[in-house]
Swiss-Prot record, chain A:
The keyword Nucleotidyltransferase appears for this protein: no
Gene assigned in the entry: apc10
Family membership noted in the UniProt record: Belongs to the APC10 family.
SUPFAM superfamilies given in the database record: Galactose-binding domain-like
InterPro entries assigned: APC10/Doc1, APC_su10/DOC_dom, Galactose-bd-like_sf
Origin species: Schizosaccharomyces pombe (strain 972 / ATCC 24843) (Fission yeast)
UniProt superkingdom: Eukaryota
GO cellular component: anaphase-promoting complex; cytosol; nucleus
Function comment: Component of the anaphase-promoting complex/cyclosome (APC/C), a cell cycle-regulated E3 ubiquitin-protein ligase complex that controls progression through mitosis and the G1 phase of the cell cycle. The APC/C is thought to confer substrate specificity and, in the presence of ubiquitin-conjugating E2 enzymes, it catalyzes the formation of protein-ubiquitin conjugates that are subsequently degraded by the 26S proteasome. Acts as a positive regulator of the anaphase promoting complex (APC)-cyclosome. Involved in G1 cell cycle arrest in response to nitrogen starvation.
Subunit structure: The APC/C is composed of at least 13 subunits: apc1, apc2, nuc2, apc4, apc5, cut9, apc8, apc10, apc11, hcn1, apc13, apc14 and apc15. Interacts with nuc2.
One GO BP: protein K11-linked ubiquitination
Domain DOC: start-end pairs: 2-187
Alphabetical keyword list: Cell cycle, Cell division, Mitosis, Ubl conjugation pathway
Name recorded for this polypeptide: Anaphase-promoting complex subunit 10
Swiss-Prot record, chain B:
Placement of PC repeats on the sequence: 873-895, 959-982, 1006-1024, 1099-1124
Record family assignment: Belongs to the APC1 family.
Chain's gene name: cut4
Task of the protein: Component of the anaphase-promoting complex/cyclosome (APC/C), a cell cycle-regulated E3 ubiquitin-protein ligase complex that controls progression through mitosis and the G1 phase of the cell cycle. The APC/C is thought to confer substrate specificity and, in the presence of ubiquitin-conjugating E2 enzymes, it catalyzes the formation of protein-ubiquitin conjugates that are subsequently degraded by the 26S proteasome. Mutations to this protein prevent the exit from mitosis.
Pfam families with a match to the protein in the record: APC1_3rd
UniProt protein name: Anaphase-promoting complex subunit 1
UniProt source species: Schizosaccharomyces pombe (strain 972 / ATCC 24843)
Database matches in InterPro entries: Apc1, Apc1_3rd, ARM-like
GO cellular component, one term: pericentric heterochromatin
Gene Ontology biological-process entries: anaphase-promoting complex-dependent catabolic process; cell division; metaphase/anaphase transition of mitotic cell cycle; mitotic sister chromatid separation; protein K11-linked ubiquitination
Phylogenetic placement of the source organism: Eukaryota, Fungi, Dikarya, Ascomycota, Taphrinomycotina
The protein's assembly and partners: The APC/C is composed of at least 13 subunits: apc1, apc2, nuc2, apc4, apc5, cut9, apc8, apc10, apc11, hcn1, apc13, apc14 and apc15.
Keywords assigned: Cell cycle, Cell division, Mitosis, Repeat, Ubl conjugation pathway
Length: 189, 1458
């Protein structure tokens, strides 16, 4: 049984990686909060890389998830793992993704309709930004509706993908050091 | 025999009101004691409760010099002090039954009641003294052989003399009492101590006390008994005289000439006795004489002039007796009499009530004055004779006061005439006519001769000269008052008569000049030879002499005639004039000193006008000069004297400001009046308020204020021009969209409107103020389409906060200085159910400090109703009313609304987060600038609390940050007792880039604000660096862009002095990495890459705006407008993509900040450049949200703060308040309070400073326009036109008014520190209208002008006789037209009265001309510097001198020809 699950997981991973090649999940840079959560199904479960666990809301719609980054980031995808077969009426159907620098200037990026999703839903938010990337400090995922007019929602995994940048030799001007001592040692001689 | 006649009392009701008994007295009436002062019941002491009989009540003076009423009951006594500032009362214990009580010079004597069966041999003392209510009773010692026996009882006390009567020996004894202080008198004390000792060891030295030379009454054993009880001696009685008299009653006394006369009556014998004692200072009085009279009643009558004894003889004759002066019999026979004050009431044998008043209650002040002077000059005995004559003339001959006085004077002279006065009766008509027009003293002389035949004036021989001289000086004094000329003439006539009799030729000649033609002298030869004294002294002549010699020549006053020097005080006018002249001619005294001297002498402006013209002109010239060079130290009196009421009302403001406003209210425009009948929706209710007069005057050149009014109007229908819209407005959804946009815009207006109407109302106690309601009606211009937003759109939630703001605006419109705001007024305005309007109204009142008047229990009623907005409004309102007071009551109220301040483990508060946010902000206001440790700690913990919840959101933490900042506002590192809190380092964690990791970011704005406010203006570089933004892009990415703005602004507020209004400084503030993108003009698209730059720029602008708030600094304005233009341009860039949209939000926010900043700089100035740009911002509809519109309207409001009457202060509190209310995170929707509590946007009211200078006309009290010269401390000179906003008070060096219409007023703020406060408080310059041109060019004579007019009315007036005299009504009327009344009046009188120049008038003119002549040289030249023509023009003076010369010449010529 465990083996099957392992395999399924592997399959899943490969599936994920296929569409996200060249991108890296930067969700760990963010602070995750949600509008409500059922006890035993906290929001951190969307970050545990386990498709069997999930976050469940506990309140009235719309449910929101806030992903707050510590710094400005450029992102390409917001990906969610939804499983209609298991969650049925708990599966979100209408999602609105907003982004901005803070709560004060959240602007709608896109609204997504999903039909009985099984597996990853990749929302290419980068397409709405500049040069295919969206610069954000804060992402808000708002679940406006569920399938079959369900009340609470299940979200199993969420990943935020940013382009994987080959860190070149660190440009001098990018180094935050300002003191003479540090600058003098920031390159290998 | 002459007898005094009495008047019949017609109306018995009135008889008590005829004369007042002037000293106070007490009367026992039943159970009460009445204290009567000046015949009016003053106090009533009631003793019904004590249920004891009142034995005695008296007024006395205790040893301490305090007057008191003493009331003695059975065993208790009450003492009430009746002094001016001492109203204590005491209860004394009376250990015996009191027979009688008498006031003594130092307290009172109490006489014990002796029962008939008392053992006569015990010989206990029965008379005690009480010297102080707190002392015990004391005994009496006797000096000499004679002592009081038990049968002696006090029957009368007067001064030192005590009269006792011995029933057994039928003897009347007189004693002198002396008070000795038992404390100070060593011999007594020691003897007392010895007595104490001796009580234990009596056997050892029983004779010790006997060795004392003083005898005392009781036998040793008994007296010791008293002494053991602690009784001491305090008074010594020494025997004077004893008479064997029995049954004597009704004692009374009069005192005169050092002789005390005590009278007593023995009813059975129908005899009265007078005992005369000579009083000698510090020695025992000695007995002079005793007289016996037949009398059935006796009483003393004391008037100011005479002290007499009224004697009623058995025959019914009443006479006034005194041992020294002649007796005055009264006509008629009488049954009884009584004395009340100086009035004698009589009942004659027919039962008719009559009275006679001895006191000369003359209506005639001249007679009164003359009498008092004569009283001073004559010895008492002579004066009594003189006054007796006066009384005879009054009452026996029924003369008037004047005639009586003249007769009594003449009588002194006629006495020395041998021949009978022969006055022939008036025979023919001609003579009668000629007599009636002339002065003559026929009647008076006739009576005088009768008087002199009755009274013995023989001692007057030596006093004739002083009497005449005294009258002469009185007449001289009268010459100094032009009003009393008829009285003076009468007196001069009397003098002429006297001097003719005395054969004093020089005096006769002198008086002849005055009245020769109108006086008929009656010849009489006087047998006594009185040598003529030195020539008649003329005060006017003396003034001329002084002016000529420019020094005070000696004046032959009364003292030079052998009269006492102190006599001169009897002539106040002469004395003060001499002092003034001395002042004028003293080279060391300035003209200002002269004015001070005048005030000291009590000479008012009115009094000056009564001086003879010459003196008047000199004094007015001085006053005129002093008016221009007033001394800054002068009090009101001096300033009033020189007629500088403007300076006076500035330096000594008396009327509160709101009094002025009432007057303004009366001025209503026609528009306002008609508004009541026309449709109310069409009337702009905002456009008229009490200050409209002033604000209209400030912006009199254009209609900018009307425009602002229109923009900030939320209560009337809005018309929009459809052609300005690209979209098609014909479809209903589109219309609805527009309507909703406009609706949101309207909702954002109230805060701004509140700024415009700030402090414009002074409601009456009965006036209900009602909020103006929103009107969302929209009129599409071409056409008549009127649309409303959907009912579903306008929900209660949508309008709740805007309504709150409307309420605040209404509350703030009530002036800070309103006096009528109290609990009942607030309750009167309270609606049935609590609304957001009322909540805001409470907050608004609180901001202006009016909630201090709210009773505590009313606040509980408000709070227990749990109406959210009401709680917020009330808590914030109370906190701001009690700003910085740490009031315990309000602290409690706030604490129960903040969970953080409740003890750990207490129940969850069921209070909304917003109320808690308001509560924690309220704590900051309440503890403002207190450095309260506990509150600082709590607020800091709240900022840094990491668990973000619904309650502790960003807004709550920000409020906590503000609170922390307010508590320690501007203290910097100087925080007493808080070093262990590590405020800086802990707050720094909250704002570091790591904050997000620790979930602290929500607290970052609060932490930044707290640090900024604590270190505000400290120029602390260390802390500024900590707040400042990092310089590298990598690190910058870690910060939320909007926090960058706060950090930049915060850093600059700390480095307050570094902030400069120039581009160099601005550029220096921008981090190097952004410099390349610095130019906003080049931005073609909105990009989120520029977010940081925009925020940095807005931050710089925000700090500039606050740094130069209210200064109107032109450079700062230029920079800010430059940025504002750039940002407005950026706002118009398309925002389609997400990135652009996100950037657009920031751009709009930054635009608002820059707009607000530029308004801040120009606060109250209503600057047109800023106004134009704000109008553009107001006109936007999409995609602007509620917050942005709110900011625009706040900017508009600040720009026109209070209609241009207010500006912003730059105190720490003001900057903090501005920081809070302009906090650059505006709500996105009307319900949004997430980042910042909307209610706190109204705190700007704490930063308002009233700085508009309003000149007012002194006469009309109406504001007026006057050019001003304002010198700043930097030396810059500004020319302004008041009313206008002044620069900040601290930067002004002096303010002076210019222009010709008003007296120039210069206020030097640098030299007088008080002036700055005065100006800050009043902001009013009261100006005196002054017509500089009139005094110089006005024609010499009004006649030619009037004669030219040809109206028939004028002709009539011209021919009438009235017009010919100088005081004609016409002249008075024409005078009043002129501003400079006195000057013109004097000129007219001077020029018109040449036809009948009297000598005095001529002298007066000579004084004037001499003055002008003297002004060319000497002391007067130095003082006047040819300014002597200020009051009278040079032409006039020259013309006058010519006329005088002509007159004198012709006069002399006539005389020669005659």
């Amino acid at each position: 049984m465990a083996q099957i699950r392992q395999e399924a997981l592997k399959k899943q991973k490969s599936e994920t990686q296929k569409s996200t090649e060249g991108f890296v999940d930067i969700g760990n840079l963010a602070q995750w909060t949600c509008s409500s959560e059922k006890s035993g199904f906290p929001i951190r479960l969307v970050r545990d890389d386990n498709i069997d666990t999930y976050w469940q809301s506990d309140g009235s719609q719309p449910h929101t998830i806030h992903i707050k980054f510590v710094k400005r980031v450029s992102i390409k995808y917001v990906s969610m793992y939804l499983q209609y077969t298991l969650d049925e009426s708990y599966t979100p159907s209408t999602l609105r993704i907003s982004a901005g620098t803070g709560f004060q200037d959240l602007e709608i990026v896109t609204t997504v309709q999903v039909e009985e999703p099984t597996g990853w839903v990749h929302v290419p938010v980068g397409d709405f930004g500049r040069n295919g990337l969206l610069d954000v400090h804060l992402i808000q995922i708002k679940i406006l509706a569920n399938h079959q007019s369900g009340k609470d929602s299940h979200v199993r995994l969420i990943k935020i993908y940013a382009p994987e940048i080959e860190q070149p030799a660190i440009a001098v001007d990018e180094i935050p050091y300002t003191s003479l001592q540090f600058i003098s040692r920031n390159q290998l001689r | 025999m002459l007898e005094l006649k009495t008047n019949v009392i017609q109306d018995p009701e009135l008889k008590d009101s005829l004369d007042l008994q002037e000293n106070d007295r007490v009367e026992i009436i039943g159970d009460a004691v009445h204290y009567i002062v000046n015949d009016h019941l003053n106090r009533v002491f009631n003793y019904t409760v004590d249920q004891q009989k009142i034995h005695a009540a008296l007024i006395t003076t205790f040893a301490s010099g305090k007057k008191a009423i003493v009331v003695i009951l059975d065993d208790i006594g009450y003492v009430y002090y009746v002094g001016d500032n001492n109203n204590d009362s005491y209860i004394i214990n009376v250990p015996f039954s009191t027979e009688s009580a008498w006031s003594s010079p130092s307290g009172l004597y109490l006489q014990r009641h002796r029962s008939s069966d008392e053992n006569l041999n015990t010989d206990l003392p029965h008379i005690f003294c009480l010297n102080d209510p707190l002392d015990e009773l004391t005994l009496i010692k006797f000096d000499g052989k004679k002592i009081l026996s038990l049968f002696d009882s006090i029957v009368y006390v007067v001064g030192e003399i005590v009269v006792t009567h011995n029933k057994k020996e039928k003897k009347l004894s007189f004693w002198r009492s002396r008070f000795i202080d038992p404390e100070s008198d060593q011999s007594i004390k020691s003897s007392r101590n010895r007595r104490r000792e001796s009580s234990f060891s009596r056997e050892k030295n029983p004779d010790l006390t006997r060795s004392d030379s003083i005898h005392y009454t009781a036998n040793t054993r008994l007296s010791e008994k008293f002494e053991e009880q602690g009784l001491a001696y305090s008074t010594i009685f020494s025997h004077i005289e004893s008479f064997p008299i029995t049954g004597s009653t009704s004692f009374d006394s009069i005192l005169g000439n050092g002789v005390l006369v005590i009278t007593t009556l023995v009813k059975e014998l129908e005899k009265g006795y007078m005992m005369l004692f000579r009083l000698v200072r510090d020695r025992s009085p000695y007995f002079l004489d005793s007289l016996q009279l037949h009398a059935i009643n006796l009483s003393a009558i004391k008037s100011k002039h005479l002290q007499k004894i009224v004697v009623l003889s058995s025959k019914g004759k009443v006479s006034l007796e005194s041992p020294m002066s002649p007796s005055l019999p009264i006509e008629g026979t009488f049954r009884s009499f009584r004395v009340h004050g100086a009035t004698l009431y009589l009942e004659d044998t027919d039962g008719v009530q009559r009275y006679i008043s001895l006191d000369n209650r003359a209506s005639n002040s001249l007679v009164k004055w003359c009498l008092s002077v004569i009283r001073y000059v004559l010895p008492l005995r002579e004066y009594e004779i003189f006054y007796t004559g006066h009384l005879y003339a009054l009452f026996a001959f029924k003369l008037s006061h004047d005639e009586a006085f003249i007769s009594s004077i003449l009588a002194c002279f006629t006495f020395f005439s041998r021949d009978k006065v022969h006055v022939e009766p008036i025979e023919d008509c001609n003579e009668a006519y000629s007599l009636s027009s002339k002065f003559h003293f026929k009647k008076e002389i006739l009576i005088a001769s009768q008087l002199s035949s009755h009274l013995d004036y023989s001692t007057f021989k030596n006093y004739l000269m002083p009497l005449a001289i005294t009258l002469h000086f009185i007449s001289e004094e009268l010459r100094l008052d032009s009003v009393v000329k008829p009285r003076k003439d009468q007196l001069v006539a009397l003098l002429l008569q006297i001097t003719t009799w005395l054969k004093w030729p020089r005096y006769c000649e002198y008086y002849n000049f005055d009245i020769a033609e109108t006086f008929l002298s009656i010849p009489l030869s006087i047998q006594v030879d009185v040598e003529e004294p030195v020539g008649p002294t003329s005060i006017l002549q003396w003034i001329i002499e002084c002016l000529r010699s420019q020094s005070t020549v000696p004046f032959y006053g009364l003292e030079s005639y052998g009269l006492p020097h102190s006599c001169s005080t009897m002539f106040p006018q002469t004395l003060s004039l001499m002092q003034l002249l001395d002042c004028l001619l003293n080279p060391n005294m300035t003209l200002q000193n002269l004015v001070e001297e005048m005030v000291r002498l009590g000479i008012s402006r009115k009094r000056c006008e009564r001086y003879p013209f010459g003196i008047l002109c000199i004094i007015f010239t001085v006053l005129e000069i002093a008016a221009e060079e007033y001394s800054p130290n002068w009090e009101s009196e001096e300033l009033r004297l020189v007629n500088r009421l403007d300076v006076d009302s500035f330096l000594h403001p008396k009327t509160p400001k709101w009094v002025f406003n009432k007057q303004d209210q009366e001025v209503k425009e026609i528009k306002a009046l008609t508004s009541t009948v026309t449709d109310s929706t069409l009337v702009d209710t905002q456009s008229f308020h009490p200050y409209k007069v002033v604000t209209d005057m400030i912006f009199r050149e254009d209609r900018r204020l009307a425009e602002v009014n229109k923009l900030l109007n939320y209560s009337s229908q809005i018309t929009i021009m459809t052609e300005h819209f690209d979209v098609d407005l014909s479809s209903v959804p589109m219309q609805q969209k527009v309507a909703q946009c406009i609706c949101v815009r309207t909702l954002s207006v109230p805060i701004g409107a509140g700024m415009l109407t700030y402090g414009s109302k002074n409601p009456l106690p009965t006036e209900k103020v009602t909020p103006r309601l929103f009107n969302f009606t929209l009129h599409l211009h071409p056409g008549t389409l009127i649309i409303q937003p959907n009912k579903e759109f306008v929900t209660q939630e949508l309008t709740e906060w805007p309504e709150f703001n409307v309420g605040v605006a209404l509350g703030l419109s009530i002036s800070k200085f309103s006096k009528e705001i109290n609990t009942s007024w607030i309750m009167f305005n309270r609606p049935e159910t609590l609304t957001a309007y009322h909540a805001g109204f409470l907050f608004g009142l609180g901001l202006n400090g009016h909630l201090k008047a709210l009773a505590t229990w009313h606040s509980f009623i408000y709070l227990t109703s749990k109406h959210d907005t009401t709680s917020i409004g009330l808590l914030l309102g109370l906190a701001s009313s009690y700003l910085g007071s740490m009031d315990a009551k309000v602290t409690k109220l706030l604490s129960v609304h903040i969970s953080a301040l409740l003890p750990v483990g207490s129940n969850e508060l069921n209070i909304s987060p917003l109320t808690q946010t308001a509560g924690i902000l309220g704590i900051g206001l309440l503890f403002h600038d207190s450095c309260h440790r506990r509150m600082s700690e709590v607020t800091m913990e709240e900022i840094l609390a990491s668990n973000e919840s619904e309650l502790k959101n960003e807004g709550y933490k920000l409020a906590a940050g503000f609170s922390l900042g307010l508590i320690n506002l501007g203290r910097g590192s100087n925080l007493p007792g808080m070093s262990d809190l590590k405020l800086v380092s802990r707050l720094q964690v909250g704002i570091s880039s790591q904050a997000t990791f620790q979930s602290l970011e929500a607290g970052s704005p609060g932490a930044i604000m707290a640090l900024t406010m604590i270190y505000m203006k400290t120029n602390d570089l260390e802390v500024a660096k900590k707040i400042d933004i990092p310089k590298s892009r990598y690190l910058l990415d870690f910060y939320r862009p909007d926090l960058i703005l706060l950090r930049v602004a915060g850093k600059n507020l700390i480095m307050w002095d570094e902030v400069k209004a120039d581009y160099e400084w601005v550029k220096y503030q921008i981090p190097d990495i952004m410099l390349s993108q610095f130019d906003l003009q080049e931005k073609k698209v909105l990009s989120s890459d520029d977010l940081l730059l925009y925020n940095v720029l807005a931050g710089i602008c925000f700090s500039l705006g606050l740094r130069f708030a209210g200064t109107g600094n032109p450079k700062a304005k230029e920079i800010l407008i430059n940025f504002l233009d750039s940002f407005i341009r950026l706002c118009h860039l398309p925002a389609k993509t997400h990135d652009e949209r996100v950037t657009a939000v920031t751009v709009i926010r930054c635009t608002q900040i820059v707009a607000l900043s530029s308004s801040c700089v120009m606060a109250g100035y209503c600057d047109l450049d800023v106004l134009r740009r704000l109008r553009v911002l107001h006109g936007r509809m999409e995609p602007v949200n509620y917050g942005a519109q709110m900011a625009t309207h706040m900017a508009l409001g600040i720009l026109s703060l209070g209609g241009g009457r207010y500006s912003l202060s730059r105190s720490n509190l003001a900057i903090a308040a501005l920081l809070i209310s302009f906090y650059p995170q505006f709500p996105r929707t009307t319900q949004d309070n997430r980042a910042h509590l909307q209610a706190a946007r109204n705190l700007w009211a704490l930063a308002v400073e009233e700085r508009c200078i309003i000149p007012r006309n002194q006469d009309t009290k109406q504001p007026c326009i006057v050019p001003l010269n304002v010198v700043q401390k930097s030396g810059a000179v500004q020319k302004l036109e008041a009313p206008i906003l002044l620069p900040p008070y601290d930067s002004i060096s002096s303010v002076s008014t210019l222009g010709d219409k008003y007296w120039n007023l210069k206020i030097d703020l640098d030299n007088n520190s008080d002036y700055r406060e005065l100006l800050r408080e009043s902001q009013t310059l009261t100006l005196m209208p002054y017509d500089r041109t009139s005094s110089k060019e006005e024609p010499l004579n009004l006649f030619p002008k009037l004669k030219d007019t040809s109206s028939p009315l004028w002709n009539l007036v011209k021919t009438s006789r009235l017009f010919q005299s100088s005081n004609s009504p016409l002249n008075v009327a024409s005078l009043q037209e002129s501003n400079n009344k006195t000057s013109l009046g004097v000129k007219l009188l001077l020029s018109m009265d040449f036809d009948n120049l009297t000598r005095d008038r001529l002298l007066s003119l000579q004084i004037l001309l001499q003055f002008f002549e003297s002004c060319w040289t000497g002391v007067l030249l130095n003082k006047f510097h040819s300014r002597q023509y200020l009051f009278l023009s040079r032409d006039l003076v020259e013309d006058l001198s010519l006329r005088v010369w002509e007159y004198v010449y012709s006069h002399n010529h006539n005389e020669e020809s005659v």
